[in-house]
């Protein structure tokens, strides 16, 4: 998946605002960032999930990994865009979007 496609999927969610900051695109809902594209470098993104949401989604794709350190243990998740499939991208972004709004981000659906 390209960074532009990832941003397009995120932009399809309700009330999403995109803002470029220092070369990365920050995606927010209700003033809370739920994903950043182009960080930690080009071809990557980072999403904020709960630890349970992170675990559930990481079981579905090798494109996700916890950020090293404390932030990763709290659900901050690195996304390798080039290996991320469309269906999983939608689930990842929906989960991060819901988490930013204080809703459950845990999926029980199988990979697909």
For every predicted segment, state its role.
Residues 1-112:
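Charge-dense, helix-prone N-terminal extensions
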């Amino acid at each position: 998946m390209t960074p532009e496609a990832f941003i397009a999927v995120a932009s399809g969610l309700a009330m999403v605002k995109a803002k470029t900051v220092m070369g990365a695109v920050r995606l927010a809902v209700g003033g809370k960032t739920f994903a950043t594209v182009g960080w930690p470098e080009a071809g990557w993104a980072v999403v904020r999930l709960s630890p349970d949401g992170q675990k559930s989604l990481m079981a579905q794709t090798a494109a996700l990994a916890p950020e090293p350190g404390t932030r990763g243990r709290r659900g901050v998740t690195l996304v390798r865009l080039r290996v991320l499939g469309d269906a999983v991208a939608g689930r990842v972004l929906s989960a991060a979007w819901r988490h930013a709004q204080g809703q459950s981000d845990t999926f029980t659906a199988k990979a697909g």
